[in-house]
């Protein structure tokens, strides 16, 4: 038998965290001034008129750096709880964590060999 009343606090949190942003958007839409003057629609660049097109294309190497950063950031999120409870978990979890780290090291070496970490 499932005891759904144990999840009441979760549903309250979910409803409140959904209602607050919706209310914020509605209130800002009602209270914001509606002026569509040319000054409001123009680009603003450090107090002077912009030169050229405002859209700039980024090179793919920046995305590769961001992707490698995200991978190792996620690794930190997974390894921190493991490190905090290392003495309780035992040898099998230690071996699993080593396999996880080895897979990430293989991915880093692959990205390094492919030149994804080269800045020039």
Curated annotation (Swiss-Prot):
Entry keyword set: Chloroplast, Membrane, NAD, NADP, Plastid, Plastoquinone, Quinone, Thylakoid, Translocase, Transmembrane, Transmembrane helix, Transport
Main location: plastid
Membrane-protein topology: Multi-pass membrane protein
Lineage: superkingdom: Eukaryota
A GO term from the CC aspect: chloroplast thylakoid membrane
UniProt-listed Enzyme Commission number(s): 7.1.1.-
Subcellular location: Plastid, Chloroplast thylakoid membrane
Transmembrane segments: 9-29, 64-84, 88-108
Enzyme class: translocase
Entry similarity comment: Belongs to the complex I subunit 3 family.
PANTHER family: NADH-UBIQUINONE OXIDOREDUCTASE CHAIN 3
HAMAP family, per the entry: NDH1_NuoA
Protein name: NAD(P)H-quinone oxidoreductase subunit 3, chloroplastic
């Amino acid at each position: 038998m499932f005891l759904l009343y144990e999840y009441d606090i979760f549903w309250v949190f979910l409803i409140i965290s959904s209602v607050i942003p919706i209310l914020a958007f509605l209130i800002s839409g009602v209270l914001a001034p509606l002026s569509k003057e040319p000054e409001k629609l123009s680009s603003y660049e450090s107090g002077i008129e912009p030169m050229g097109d405002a859209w700039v294309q980024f090179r793919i190497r920046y995305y590769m750096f961001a992707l490698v950063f995200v991978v190792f950031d996620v690794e930190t999120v997974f390894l921190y709880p493991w490190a905090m409870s290392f003495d309780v978990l035992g040898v099998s979890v230690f071996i699993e964590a080593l396999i996880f780290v080895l897979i990430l090291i293989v991915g880093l070496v692959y990205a390094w060999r492919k030149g994804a970490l080269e800045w020039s």
